[in-house]
UniProtKB/Swiss-Prot annotation:
The active site is at C73, H161, E163. Heterodimer composed of a glutamine amidotransferase subunit (A) and a GMP-binding subunit (B). The keyword ATP-binding applies. It is an enzyme of class 6 (ligase). Keywords: ATP-binding, Glutamine amidotransferase, GMP biosynthesis, Ligase, Nucleotide-binding, Purine biosynthesis. This is GMP synthase [glutamine-hydrolyzing] subunit A. Residues 3-184 form the Glutamine amidotransferase type-1 domain. Its EC number is 6.3.5.2. It catalyses: XMP + L-glutamine + ATP + H2O = GMP + L-glutamate + AMP + diphosphate + 2 H(+). SUPFAM superfamilies: Class I glutamine amidotransferase-like. Catalyzes the synthesis of GMP from XMP.
Length: 184
């Protein structure tokens, strides 16, 4: 059975990420972000959202593990910042119902959502510049980089929250990540 840990970066929806994976039959565990990387035994990691970069614990070190990583909201932002991209204030700010255009139908994480999907997103901060090796896989009218992927390193990020009911295909994002982690 595929095992995916959800790293708690103190976001308000982290428990929903854990539940979404559990409901898909994934062996999942919610771990605190101060868990030493060498203690993680998993096929994949979800870096949850959270309030700010000052409370990300060991999350940057988890990017060095040789397993797939999905960053959600702050998780995507910290991935971008740690790997050489740039994060800045969003023009929109706050939570909103957003229509996202999928740019890469072959992307293993979100390509199946093409041509577009409606999501619940927060854009107080966002990725402004991609790290080397990443491709922009989704965009919207309020955020230029709604999702990013580096399929060579199995690193994926979404600005939105697939774990909340307002995101129409959120479960599919978690299914796709489960399949990535299982090597399917």
């Amino acid at each position: 059975m595929t095992r995916i840990v959800v790293v708690d970066n103190h976001g308000q929806f982290t428990h929903l990420e854990h539940r979404a994976l559990r409901d898909l039959g994934v062996d999942t565990e919610l771990i605190d972000n101060d868990t030493p990387p060498e203690e993680i035994d998993a096929d994949g990691i979800v870096l949850s959202g959270g309030p700010d970069m000052d409370r990300i614990g060991h999350s940057p070190a988890y990017l060095d593990l040789d397993i797939p990583v999905l960053g959600i909201c702050l998780g995507m932002q910290l991935m971008a910042a740690e790997l050489g991209g740039r994060v800045g204030a969003g023009d929109y700010g706050g939570y909103a119902d957003v229509t996202v255009s999928i740019e890469d139908e072959s992307d293993p994480l979100i390509g199946s959502l093409a041509p577009e999907t409606r999501v619940w997103a927060s854009h107080a901060d966002e990725v402004k510049e991609l790290p080397d090796g990443f491709e922009r896989t989704a965009t919207s009218e309020v955020c230029n980089i709604e999702a990013m992927s580096d399929t060579d390193r199995n690193r994926y990020g979404v600005q939105w929250h697939p774990e909340v009911a307002h995101t129409e295909a959120g479960e599919e994002v978690f299914e796709n990540f489960r399949d990535i982690c299982a090597g399917d």
